[in-house]
Amino acid sequence: MASSFWKGVVGIGLFALAHAAFSAAQHRSYMRLTEKENETLPIDIVLQTLLSFVITCYGIVHISGEFKDMDASSELKNKTFDTLRNHPSFYLFNHRGRVLFRTPEQEPSTPNAQALPSNPLRLRKLENFH
């Protein structure tokens, strides 16, 4: 859990960033009124923007916690080889293998099934087993 100090730093940084944005918008509207549209932002607004951005990023880095290693071996060393690529949600038991490798004793005895021509692919696969 992040300490309240770093959350306060992020809050102050965001507040300063919002203040810099408001100051830049106010300066731009002032420049339009005085018809000096080609002027750049004053250095204090630019510095406040950059400093508040750095403070906010620094606080967020401390709030985020520990970073993970980029090396995958540190995370994979706790897993066995069997569980490495094991995805049980992709298991499918209702597939065409039951129909392709059915023995003649298991053929359905319905008149509809006998009226259909036999599957040549299934017969070729069964011939290889005999």
Swiss-Prot record:
Coiled coil: none annotated. Component of the ER membrane protein complex (EMC). It is a multi-pass membrane protein. One of its GO terms (cellular component) is plasma membrane. Part of the endoplasmic reticulum membrane protein complex (EMC) that enables the energy-independent insertion into endoplasmic reticulum membranes of newly synthesized membrane proteins. Preferentially accommodates proteins with transmembrane domains that are weakly hydrophobic or contain destabilizing features such as charged and aromatic residues. Involved in the cotranslational insertion of multi-pass membrane proteins in which stop-transfer membrane-anchor sequences become ER membrane spanning helices. One of its GO terms (molecular function) is inorganic cation transmembrane transporter activity. Keywords: Endoplasmic reticulum, Endosome, Golgi apparatus, Magnesium, Membrane, Transmembrane, Transmembrane helix, Transport. The lineage of its organism: Eukaryota, Metazoa, Chordata, Craniata, Vertebrata. This is ER membrane protein complex subunit 5. InterPro entries: MMgT (IPR018937).
